Amino acid sequence: MDIPLSSDALDLCFHPAAETNLLAVGLISGKIQLINYDDYLSSPSSSRTPLAPPSKKSKPSTISSAVETPTKLYRKLYTSRPSKKSCRGLHFSTTGSSIFSISKDKSLFSTDTQTGKVVQSWIEVHDAAPSRVLPVDESLVVTGDDDGVVRLWDVRKGGGKGIKPVRMWEHHFDWITDMVYLADLPVPKPKSIKEAKKSKTQLKKQRRRARQAERLKEHDKEKREQNASDTEASEPDSEDDAAIKVESRSRLIVTSGDGSLSSIDLLSSGPTSFEQSEDQEDELLSITSIRSSTKLVVGTQLGILSLWTPSRGLLDHVDRVPGHPASVDTLVTLDNETVLTGSSDGLVRVVQILPSKLLGVIASHNGLPVERMKRKQSVLASIGHTNAVKLTDLSPLLDDNDDQGDDDDEQAGALGIVGLAEDDSDDDDDDDDDDDDDDDEKHLVVELDGAEQTDGDAESGQDDEQDPDSEDVTPSQNKAGKGGFFSDL
C-alpha cells in the first residue's frame, strides 16, 4: 500500500510502543507527517497487497469498478514543520513521547508526539548539515553530520542557539551514513595460541595475572566463609550476574562514507573511547545486527554485504556476501538469519545471511532508489525518491504455518516459506569454528601452564598442526526449491 505525501520523503520511523501504530515521516519541505495505520493492520492480508495489473482480455467494467472503490487504510493525524529547511532525519524517543528531527540548517528539534509542537530546539549546533539522528535513552541523543562528526546531546540541559554537545568524536572524515546502538555487544575473545607464541614476555605476564587472579579468588572465598549464612546464598548469584555483565558492552556502531566502521563508548571520551576499523575501500552505507548482536551486516556502495563478528574484534570484516547489482542503501533485520535489503535499483530483497542465499523480492519502488526502510512487527515501511511511503505486509514471511499440516511444516524452509529448503551448512561451519576457538583456548591454557617445560611447547605445536585438518568443511550444494512464496525467481 502506498501512502501519498505532500512532498518527497527523506526519513521515517515507527513508534516504539507495540500497541501504538504510528508512523512519522520527514519530508524534503521540512515538514513532519504523523500517520496512523490501524486500519491497515485490521484489514485482511489480501487487501493489503496491490492489485495485479489487468490483462488485455479483461472487461472495462471490471477494471473501472476496481479503480472506483479504493480502500483507504490510513489516517494522517497532523503535519508539523519545525524548520523551513529539509528534514534530513527523524527518530522517536525511546518512550515515544517526542520526535527528534534534524534539518539542513544544522539544527536539532524535539517535537511532542501528541500535539506536534516543538518542545526544544538546538539551533545551528552543527558545523555541517546533520545526516543521522538516534536517541540512546530518554535523555541522550546522538547525531552525525556530513563532515563525519558524531555528537552526543543531553536533553536535560535544554536547547538554545550554539550550544555545545556533551561529547564529540571526529575520527571520521566523511558523512555519517548509519548508526545503531547495541547495549549487549559481545566482548572480543582473547588472542589465539598462535598470537601468544610470538612473545614469551606476554606468556609470563599472563601467567603472573593468572596467579594474581587465583589469589584474589582465594581471598574472596575466605571472606565469604566469614559472612553470615543468609548472605552466603545470595553472593554466588551476584557473582554470576557480574560475570555475565562482563561478557557484553554497550557501544554505538557508526558507518561512514570514508569506508570505515567505528565502535564508540558513549560513557567515555578521548582517543581510547572509540575503535575504528581498517579502510574497506568502499563506502559503508547501512548497518543492522542479527543473532542477538553477535553478527553485524553492513551494506556497501558496490552492492556487497560485509559480515562483522564483534567477538573477533571490529577491525575488519570476516565474510562478504555479493549478489546485489547496485548499492545497498538500507538494511532491516527480519530474524536471526535473514535481513531485508533496500537497493538503489528500487527492489527490496529478502537475503538469508547464514547461509548466504537470496530468497526473493518483496517490494519494488519502480526503479527508484530505496532510501530508508523501517520494520515494526509484520509491517515494513520504505521510501524512495517519490512523495509516497510504501507499506509492505511481512506476514507471509513471518507466518508459522499454524493452519497447515505437519507435512507442510516439514517442507517449510527458511522463514517458514514452503518450498525453500533449509541449509544447515553454515550452522555446521559455526559449530566447527566454535570448536576451533575452544581448541585454541585449551591449547593456550596448556601452554601457559607448561611454559616452563620444553615438552609442553612441543605438544602444543603438534596440536596446532592438527588444527587446519579440523577446519575442513564440505560446502553444501543445497538450493532453494521452486514453487515457494517467491516462485517467480
UniProtKB/Swiss-Prot annotation:
PROSITE patterns to which the protein is assigned, alphabetical: WD_REPEATS_1, WD_REPEATS_2, WD_REPEATS_REGION
Acidic residues biased stretches: 232-241, 421-440, 449-472
Biased composition (Basic and acidic residues): 211-227
Annotated segments matching region Disordered: 46-66, 192-246, 417-489
Gene3D superfamilies linked: YVTN repeat-like/Quinoprotein amine dehydrogenase
Coiled-coil intervals: none
Annotated keywords: Nucleus, Repeat, WD repeat
Stretches with biased composition (Basic residues): 199-210
Family matches, as Pfam families: WD40
SMART domains tied to this protein: WD40 (SM00320)
The organism's place on the tree of life at top rank: Eukaryota
GO CC term (a single one): nucleolus
Ranges of the WD repeats in the UniProt entry: 4-45, 124-163, 279-318, 323-363
UniProt cross-references to InterPro entries, sorted A to Z: WD40/YVTN_repeat-like_dom_sf, WD40_repeat_CS, WD40_repeat_dom_sf, WD40_rpt, WDR55_POC1
Subcellular location(s) per record: Nucleus, Nucleolus
Sequence similarity: Belongs to the WD repeat WDR55 family.
This protein's name: WD repeat-containing protein JIP5
Natural source organism: Mycosarcoma maydis
Lineage summary: Eukaryota, Fungi, Dikarya, Basidiomycota, Ustilaginomycotina
